Amino acid sequence: MNQKENNYQLVYNHIKQKVGNFSPQICLILGSGLGVFASEINKHFIFDTNDLKGYPKSTVSGHKGNIIFGEINEKKILAFQGRIHYYEGYSLNEVVFPIILAKMFNISTLITTNVSGGINPSYKPGDIVFLDNHINLTFKNPISVIPKSLRIKRKYKLCEYEPKIL
């Protein structure tokens, strides 16, 4: 196991020891504008990422850096209150950390949020926009750094969006 995989395992073990048998079904990664959504979660466990050795810290204003285990409408949730960005200087191994933790908790449904209002001037703050594709201007594939044992097997490799959720 290399150092990156060791960091994933250390953080997972620390969290798992605290949450025990709590088994989230859905992972939410809350970006700018929806961090406040965390107030809607009936929280069972909250982890400050500043206290998790090996976990990258978000530097974006408004990203609290909490990992929350809780419930919304009787659905068990793992929520990341703040995202980690490649443009912050983090490696792809660090950017995918929340995805890897979600997979380690056997979560198969992932919902990420972001600010995308700039793509259409008719969008207003708070509008919900479902994306079914994206343009990767970094020319880096974050999936390539996820250990093969933790990758979700997909029928279609080019697009990781799930039509039934959209």
Describe the predicted segments one by one:
Residues 2-13, 50-166:
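Glycine-rich phosphate- or other oxyanion-binding loops that anchor nucleotides, phosphorylated ligands
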Residues 22-53, 61-62:
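N-terminal low-complexity or amphipathic/hydrophobic leaders
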Residues 1-26, 30-37:
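Long, non-catalytic terminal segments
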